[in-house]
């Protein structure tokens, strides 16, 4: 945490590119086609999208307080975000960055993963619990 850039490193040449992403990035995921980098910005409670070809920030949305971890659906249509101090998870549609759903998860959620086979969202809570939610919301 800290800073405002993501370092993209070419593993063949070790050349480094810097992507300006916003203050205090916490977690990142790539779109299924590797063209968009999604990141949580912990201090502002936002999720941002950066086009990797243009290196430009293209979308941003507030999801809660202290956005931490995130995951993406297998088809790339939705992001799932845990918001640590607001004790919630948010579902964001990637096409327009609309928050489709925000629900109480647990006290201080810190990790999240999307399970495509059964369309479930698994959430790790700071106190040690694991919560499982059905992703039944229509996209």
Show which residues each predicted segment covers:
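Predominantly soluble domains enriched in secretory-pathway, periplasmic, or organellar proteins
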Residues: 1-139
């Amino acid at each position: 945490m800290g800073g405002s850039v993501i370092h993209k490193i070419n593993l063949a040449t070790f050349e480094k590119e810097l992507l300006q992403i916003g203050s205090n990035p916490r977690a990142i995921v790539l779109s299924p086609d590797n063209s968009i980098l999604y990141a949580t910005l912990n201090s502002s409670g936002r999720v941002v999208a950066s086009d990797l070809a243009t290196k430009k920030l293209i979308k941003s949305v507030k999801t809660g307080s202290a956005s931490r971890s995130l995951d993406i659906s297998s088809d790339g249509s939705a992001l799932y975000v845990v918001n640590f101090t607001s004790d919630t998870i948010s579902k964001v549609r990637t096409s327009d960055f609309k928050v489709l759903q925000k629900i109480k998860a647990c006290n201080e959620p810190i990790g999240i993963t999307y399970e495509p086979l059964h369309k479930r969202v698994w959430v790790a809570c700071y106190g040690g619990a694991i919560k499982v939610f059905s992703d039944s919301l229509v996209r």
